Design a protein with these regions (language model features):
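Short helix-capping/linker turns of helical repeat alpha-solenoids
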Residues: 4-5, 16-17, 34-38, 49-51, ...
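N-terminal segments that cap or nucleate solenoid repeat domains
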Residues: 1-43
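Hydrophobic face of amphipathic alpha-helices that form TPR/SEL1-like repeat modules
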Residues: 9-18, 43-51, 76-83, 112-119, ...
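Terminal, low-structured helical/coil segments at or just beyond the last alpha-helical repeat
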Residues: 2, 172-188
């Protein structure tokens, strides 16, 4: 029988993870990561972040995942820098890793970068850029990005005020599971 390739190892790891067999999942992810599979490295980061609570190791694996062009790994690394977890809080680095994640089509990275631009954290406040990153997040089916973009259209911040577009984005956010957006639609 042929040796499993990195993608197969990652998939086997995910099956084990879903069954809550974290020990077995870690072994598969370690093998996948050792073969330079970004998803395997990112999943190892998740294990150390969420299950084993070792943020130093989580940071190392997210960093390797990001280096291997895994958008989720870049986004998770950005989260650690934004939230002062395992690394010193650094919003400039958070923005950098969210930008990398977004460039790799990670919706969460785009959304988080939009939030940083919206609030002027780690980057200069820029509602036009916030709208751009929320829009990209929404295209990638990130519910918060759709809802936040709807909010910008509703208020006319960073984009021309357009209540029809606001409702369209709130509706998309609601369909993607954003309860706050669903509530906004109910109030109309």
């Amino acid at each position: 029988m042929a040796k499993p390739n990195p993608e197969e190892l990652f998939n086997l790891g995910m099956l084990s993870y879903d069954k809550q067999d974290f020990s077995k999942a870690r072994k598969y992810f370690e093998r996948a990561c050792g073969l330079n599979n970004g998803g395997g490295c990112g999943a190892l980061g998740d294990l150390y972040d969420d299950v084993e609570k070792n943020l130093i190791k989580a940071t190392q694996f997210y960093s390797k995942a990001c280096d291997l062009k895994d958008g989720r790994g870049c986004g998770s690394l950005g989260d650690l820098y934004e939230n002062d977890q395992g690394v010193e809080k650094d919003l400039i680095k958070a923005a950098y890793f969210y930008s990398k994640a977004c460039d790799l089509n990670n919706g969460g990275g785009c959304k988080n970068l939009g939030v940083l631009y919206h609030n002027g954290e780690g980057v200069e406040k820029d509602l036009i850029k916030a709208a751009y990153f929320y829009s990209k997040a929404c295209e990638l089916k990130e519910s918060f990005g759709c809802g936040a973009l709807g909010g910008l259209y509703y208020s006319g911040d960073g984009v021309e005020k357009n209540l029809t577009k606001a409702d369209q984005y709130f509706s998309k956010a609601c369909k993607l599971g954003d309860q706050e957006a669903c509530e906004v639609l109910k109030e109309k």
